[in-house]
Amino acid sequence: MENFYKVGTIVNTQGLQGEVRILPSTDFANERFSKGAVLALFDDKDNYIQDLKVKSGRLQKNFYVVKFEGFYHINDVEKYKGYVVKIAQENQEELNDGEFYYHEIIGSDVYDNDILIGQISEILQPGANDVWVVKRKGKRDLLLPYIPPVVLKVDVAQHRVDVDIMEGLDD
């Protein structure tokens, strides 16, 4: 089976016409949830269910409201709450140098002055820039803003991120 990468989670229904609310987990949400996009639906046990073609999608607050082709009523989609939508690796576009997909960053080791401080476990999108959550042993999670003074180098091939933890970030 080909590789799939998570782009969002269906968190609720929207209205009565078969639309769902999706909490995105991708930098490319506008592309992923636009008309004609094909996504794969996976259940809460990560079993593939079916491919879905986006009929329409729009941003509403922190969610995307998406209608898939073939689903016309709330009863058609209600059972998919908590399910995950993913994109097939073959449908991912090539990125420019210095750009990367979330799945390439999550799990990477994080170093400050060549000292391992933890692993990236999650990427948050609170506003102007992404925030990388670093899991550390014996300490609370570290929240690193993805900005040039903090993130110095990202080596996707080596799963390594070099950072400079500025004063005040690790209090």
From Swiss-Prot:
One of its GO terms (cellular component) is cytoplasm. Belongs to the RimM family. Its main location: cytoplasm. InterPro entries: PRC-brl_dom, PRC_barrel-like_sf, RimM, RimM_N, RimM_N_sf, Transl_B-barrel_sf. Binds ribosomal protein uS19. It comes from Lactococcus lactis subsp. cremoris (strain MG1363). One of its GO terms (biological process) is rRNA processing. Keywords: Chaperone, Cytoplasm, Ribosome biogenesis, rRNA processing. The PRC barrel domain binds ribosomal protein uS19. Residues 97-169 form the PRC barrel domain. GO terms for molecular function: ribosome binding. An accessory protein needed during the final step in the assembly of 30S ribosomal subunit, possibly for assembly of the head region. Essential for efficient processing of 16S rRNA. May be needed both before and after RbfA during the maturation of 16S rRNA. It has affinity for free ribosomal 30S subunits but not for 70S ribosomes. It holds the Pfam family PRC. SUPFAM superfamilies: PRC-barrel domain, Translation proteins. This is Ribosome maturation factor RimM. The gene is rimM. It is found in: Cytoplasm.
